[in-house]
Amino acid sequence: MQREKNIVRAKVFGRKDNPTPEIVMQRIRVRLLGKLARRILPIIRKGFAGVGNGTAYNAFMSANMIQVTVDENMNGSIDFEGLKLASGLLYTPRVEVTCEGTPQVYRFVQTAEEAEEGFAALDDKVYGVLMETALQRVRLVALKNRGVAGETEVPLPAEWNADKVNVYCFAVSRNERIVSDSVFLPLSTQA
């Protein structure tokens, strides 16, 4: 029996690159979008279902990297109106949202839709998403099925700032394998 000595030498090193402004900007984009993605991960998992071998997180990052801008002072910002919380082949649902009251209440108004073979079924589940951008918190709201018209009211959580809330919607098939693209819903206020 032979006794051999295995010696492994590891060199611990930091990053030794000399980053160009483009590299620094890309790192800021990834850091900013990654921080948001971790906060809204349950929405991403539902909205990027069935993306294949990649993860829902990677699909979200890939779809939304263009929504992050970095200025010359290396300050990053996200265009929340263009943000995609879901991506897929289904047709987007027809939903409108209004905000009313002193304790803010969001009313989602759905229009009944017809079935389209392969792209929209009457039993597709429609979801609304309330996103508070300052706190980076989200609330997933289950609305009615695609074939049903109606309204769903959701009160705004007390600690949320109503001026910083963005609203989105998307549809998910009954088996939750196919989704639609998400749609940013402009808010109309009523007195």
Labelled PLM ranges:
Residues M1-R94:
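Long, polar/Ser/Thr-enriched low-complexity segments
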